[in-house]
From Swiss-Prot:
EC number: 1.4.3.3
Recorded catalytic activity of this chain's protein: a D-alpha-amino acid + O2 + H2O = a 2-oxocarboxylate + H2O2 + NH4(+)
Domain of life of the organism encoding this protein: Bacteria
Cofactors demanded by this protein: FAD
Protein's name according to its UniProt entry: D-amino-acid oxidase
Family: Belongs to the DAMOX/DASOX family.
Gene Ontology BP annotations: aerobic respiration; D-amino acid catabolic process; glycine catabolic process
PANTHER family assigned: D-AMINO ACID OXIDASE, D-ASPARTATE OXIDASE
SUPFAM superfamilies named in the record: FAD-linked reductases, C-terminal domain (SSF54373), Nucleotide-binding domain (SSF51971)
Binding sites annotated in the UniProt record for D-proline: 220, 274, 300
Keywords, ordered alphabetically: Cell wall, Cytoplasm, FAD, Flavoprotein, Oxidoreductase, Secreted
Entry function: Catalyzes the oxidative deamination of D-amino acids with broad substrate specificity. Enables the organism to utilize D-amino acids as a source of nutrients. Enables the organism to utilize glycine as a carbon source.
């Protein structure tokens, strides 16, 4: 299709929708964003967040997408206003102890085994690396401003079906996240409830992640003004109401690993529903006379996959 001749509607204003809209608009496509929720009200806004590779289908494509995203985040980290910082990280956990290191870590030049003295009690091994950490409220504002600079505005417009957008534009990008379950009729999309506790930062500069196959783990993301602590994942739970018992467990675990967090005051408890799916879906599908490009099913890896998947969207639109 000829760039500039076809109107594009992007559905969704989370990190996937904004990034896709930016890539399309900066490539010359006229873009509109329709969203049920504005960026700061999306699940993306309550993410930790860090670029961190994890096993995910389709493996070969995901490997390329996370690598593309890493390159972009490294560039963004050169400007503090983006909310992206290259941050020292310590990761520990049973997946490391068994040697099953996450694919993609070879992309990090300074990844190295942690000295046993650096590994908290209860864990046998870990690794150090410098990873892109993203302060999501600040980052979403940055993306929104970058999108606005292209002349694109975000319209609050909930949809009942993709056909509504297909009637308004010949190209539709479905970045609806969990909403894709209804909009795309995809019963394989399910929520995974997550809860974070946000604390004041007592002077921490490192992020910590426990890698485990369990439903609860230890993590904290030390942003300049706050520390986001987690984590938990409850599959199939639709209720976003925070639970005080979960808050207490998160605080106890994180303060055991990092005693300085005992000095920090609780600012708020935040929750979100991660849009889980057996595999990430980035592919084209005709809807009536329109071309629909799906970009959803990222689960808890929306940030890590965002730029790679968005560039794939641009390629699919251009090849449509």
């Amino acid at each position: 299709m000829a760039i500039g001749e076809q109107q594009v509607i992007v559905i969704g204003a989370g990190v996937s929708g904004l990034t896709s809209a930016i890539c399309l608009a900066e490539a010359g496509w006229p873009v509109r964003v329709w969203a049920a929720a504005l960026p700061q009200q999306t699940t993306s806004a309550v993410a930790g967040a860090v670029w961190g590779p994890r096993p995910k289908e389709p493996v070969a494509k995901v490997r390329g997408w996370i690598e593309q995203s890493l390159h972009v985040f490294r560039d963004l980290a050169k400007d503090p206003a983006t909310g992206v910082r290259m941050t020292p990280a310590l990761s520990v956990g049973d997946r490391i102890e068994t040697g099953a290191m996450p694919p993609g870590l070879e992309l990090i030049p300074d990844v190295r085994p942690a000295d046993p003295a650096d590994v908290p009690g209860g864990f046998r091994a870990g690794f150090h690396a410098t990873l892109p950490m993203i302060d999501m409220p600040q980052y979403l504002d940055c993306l929104t401003q970058r999108l606005a600079a292209t002349g694109c505005e975000i319209e609050t417009r909930p949809l009942r079906s993709l056909a509504e957008a297909a009637e308004a534009a010949p190209i539709v990008i479905n970045c609806a996240g969990l909403g894709a379950r209804e909009l795309a009729g995809d019963a394989t999309v399910w929520p995974r409830f997550g809860q974070h506790v946000v604390l004041t930062n007592p002077g921490l500069e490192q992020l910590f992640i426990e890698r485990t196959g369990g439903s609860e783990w230890i993590c904290y993301f030390a942003h300049p003004q706050r520390v986001v602590c987690g984590g938990i994942s409850i599959p199939g739970r639709w209720d976003p109401t925070p639970e005080p018992e979960i808050t207490e467990r998160i605080l106890q675990r994180c303060r055991r690993i990092q005693p300085r967090l005992a000095e920090a005051a609780v600012i708020e408890t935040i929750t979100g529903l991660r849009p889980d799916r057996p595999s990430v879906r980035v592919e084209a599908e005709p809807i009536g006379r329109a071309l629909c490009i799906h970009n959803y099913g990222h689960g808890g890896d929306g940030v890590t996959l965002s730029w790679g998947c968005a560039r794939e969207v641009v390629n699919l639109v251009g090849g449509g």
